[in-house]
């Protein structure tokens, strides 16, 4: 009897044989990045839409590298490396400014930003070099281990399919801006923000402005300003993270707290900032350019960098036309958010950053006040001076005691340690400001000074104590809606040998972009046509700027400034 035919190896046996031939390590090299990404997705993405966006973004990255390299193992490793770096940077950004990274961060990165990071983190350069020395051999090993080769055309088609799906989903279901305050969804929010950013840029560019009109502003003439009476020296003080904490219920404050927020006439006045918790440069744009960062929409985070060389309008320029010299003392490196370039664009003639001033680290307010007194003594005789003093001692974190040697008799009121430290630093600021006023009177007897101080934004913990019953999402929605309670700080006007001019512009509550107007009015400086127009807006809108008529007044003023040549390329 003939033997039965041999059916050959089973399908399972064939697969196992193939695996054995390829080697388990080679297969793991291909699979491991995808498994790691899967774990990361479940850890960082919170809902179906975010996870779908993560998968599509992961597909875009992988198929991009496969189309370029044809090796899926190396492509997966490169994609995973990019995602991990993004997550780390996003978490760092959230720790600093309470917002995660988005696509616009990538759009706006430049040499100044990289130089600033390497300067403030001196070990970062070596960390990058070390990471490169470790990563490059690993990538070469993956190149050698990878057993697969994928054709470029199918990979490119797959990448475009993932991109089309992500764009379609993002347009159909755009990510709400308030979700940026959540410390999650790093990859999905980054890619979806790219769709929104490109859409917004195509619609109105970097900055909103109204359609062209027949209205025109006259360009102000140089030295065409002739104020009545003696022009005071003007000092504007940027009071870092300062607001009246009594706005929150249940906070214990030391005796006498609150006097620092009063003006020369005994009144307390409110300043409505356009940021909360971190980005001081929003307010820097407000008080120097006299315009709204909110006009830049999703691009507002980079407002000073975008405005550099483009927005040639502001308080320093207006004062220079009235014969003032202009000077700025800045507590960080001048490359940070293009601070030096931006301030020069708005009319600052002499910009001194922390390196120029000899600052060793975060310095107390007295350091900058003492430097200002010395520098003001070097000014041109009989010529008024505008000085912008940018303070930083009350910057977060408040978990550590700043300069324990200062204010030795301080007694904590009995709040949580971070709030007590915040109050301690406010007390230091008040004491050192009073010493600065005394220094002005002693060093410049008989000379007139107008001093205007403002809190640039509330501290990062403020929303939680102002609205203790709300979770992170509800607070994010209130912040996104610009609830005034979460943006209110203070502004105060003081004077030495000068009586501030009474003006209807010196209101009890003003939006940040109106502060340059308030300063000029209080100093008795004639307004140029652009500020005269802005004063009319201020009176019509009762101290509200961007929020008036859903931004229509701000867009109209932007258009007038564009047509007058004060704003270019936006």
Segments from the language model and where they lie:
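Generic structural signal of hydrophobic/aromatic residues within well-ordered alpha-helices
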Residues: 36-37, 113, 117, 198, ...
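General structural signal for secondary-structure boundaries
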Residues: 97-105, 119-126, 202-215, 280, ...
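Solvent-exposed soluble domains appended to multi-pass membrane proteins
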Residues: 223-226, 236-239, 244-570
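A broad, low-specificity signal for short, low-complexity segments enriched in glycine/proline
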Residues: 74-76, 91-96, 196, 287-289, ...
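Transmembrane and membrane-interface helices of multi-pass
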Residues: 1-187
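Membrane-interface segments at or immediately adjacent to transmembrane helices
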Residues: 168-238, 248-249
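Membrane-interface transmembrane-helix boundary segments in multi-pass integral membrane proteins
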Residues: 115-131, 190, 198-202, 419-426
């Amino acid at each position: 009897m003939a033997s039965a035919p041999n059916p050959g190896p089973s399908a399972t046996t064939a697969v196992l044989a193939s695996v054995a031939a390829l080697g388990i390590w080679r297969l793991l090299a291909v699979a491991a990045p995808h498994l790691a990404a899967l774990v990361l997705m479940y850890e960082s993405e919170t809902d179906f839409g975010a996870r779908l966006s993560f998968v599509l973004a992961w597909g875009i990255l992988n198929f991009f590298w496969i189309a370029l390299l044809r090796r899926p193992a190396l492509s997966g490793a490169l994609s995973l490396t990019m995602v991990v770096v993004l997550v780390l940077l996003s978490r760092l950004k959230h720790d600093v400014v309470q917002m995660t990274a988005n696509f616009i961060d990538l759009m706006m990165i430049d040499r100044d930003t990289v130089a600033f990071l390497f300067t403030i983190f001196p070990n970062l350069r070596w960390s990058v070099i070390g990471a490169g020395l470790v990563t490059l051999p690993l990538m070469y090993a993956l190149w050698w281990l990878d057993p697969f080769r994928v054709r470029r055309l199918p990979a490119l088609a797959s990448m475009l399919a993932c991109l089309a799906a992500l764009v379609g989903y993002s347009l159909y279901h755009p990510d709400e801006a308030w979700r940026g305050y959540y410390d999650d969804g790093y990859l999905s929010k980054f890619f979806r923000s790219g769709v929104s950013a490109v859409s917004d840029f195509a619609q109105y560019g970097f900055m909103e402005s109204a359609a062209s009109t027949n209205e025109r502003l006259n360009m102000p003439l140089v030295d065409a300003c002739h104020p009545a009476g003696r022009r005071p020296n003007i000092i504007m003080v940027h009071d870092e993270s300062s607001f009246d904490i009594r706005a929150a219920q249940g906070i214990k404050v030391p005796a006498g707290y609150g006097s620092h927020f009063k003006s020369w006439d005994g009144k307390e006045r409110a300043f409505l900032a356009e940021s909360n918790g971190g980005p001081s440069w929003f307010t820097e744009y407000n008080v120097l350019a006299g315009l709204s960062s909110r006009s830049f929409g999703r691009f507002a985070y980079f407002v000073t960098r975008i405005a550099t060389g483009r927005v040639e309008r502001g308080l320093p320029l207006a004062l220079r036309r009235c014969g003032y010299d202009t000077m700025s003392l800045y507590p960080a490196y001048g490359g940070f958010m293009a601070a030096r370039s931006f301030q020069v664009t708005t009319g600052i003639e002499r910009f001194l950053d922390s390196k120029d001033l000899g600052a060793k680290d975060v310095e107390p307010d007295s350091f900058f006040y003492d430097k200002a007194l010395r520098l003001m003594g070097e000014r041109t005789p009989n010529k008024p001076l505008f000085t912008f003093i940018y303070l930083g001692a009350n910057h977060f974190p408040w978990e550590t005691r700043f300069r324990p040697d200062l204010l030795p008799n301080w007694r904590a009121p009995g709040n949580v340690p971070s709030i007590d430290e915040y109050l301690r630093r406010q007390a230091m600021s008040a004491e050192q400001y009073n010493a600065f006023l005394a220094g002005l009177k002693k060093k410049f007897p008989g000379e007139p000074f107008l001093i205007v101080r403002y809190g640039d934004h509330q501290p990062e913990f403020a929303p939680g104590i102002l609205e203790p019953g709300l979770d992170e999402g509800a607070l994010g929605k209130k912040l996104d809606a610009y609830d005034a309670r979460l943006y209110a700080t203070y502004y105060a006007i003081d004077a030495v040998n000068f009586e501030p001019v009474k003006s209807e512009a010196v209101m009890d509550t003003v939006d940040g972009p109106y502060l340059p107007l308030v300063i000029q009015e209080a100093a008795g400086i004639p307004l140029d046509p652009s500020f005269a127009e802005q004063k009319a807006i201020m009176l019509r809108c009762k101290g509200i700027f961007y929020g008036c008529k859903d931004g229509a007044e701000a867009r109209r003023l932007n258009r007038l400034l564009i047509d007058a040549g004060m704003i270019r390329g936006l």
